[in-house]
Amino acid sequence: MEDYVIIVNRIEDLQLTQDRSELELIFERAKRTIVGGQDVILVRQNRNGQEEKFQTISNEQDFEEYRKQVFRFL
């Protein structure tokens, strides 16, 4: 299994549209990655399409904190 990349811009868009089901799918995949021993990498995409990595989540506790933070705004 490979590391799972979450593009934070996409998460923010889904928060704005309150697309809970799509967010759940993303976070289910991410959790399976963590449980499988790989990392979840948070990146931000700039206007040129370049991705800038700004955080790596490697354990379930940190992942759950990030998940709560995202869903708190829905």
Question: Model-derived features: where do they sit?
Answer:
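Extended interaction regions within the primary functional domain
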Residues: M1, T17-R20, G49-E51, L74
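Short aromatic-glycine-(Arg/Gly/Cys) micro-motifs in beta-strand/loop hairpins
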Residues: M1-D13
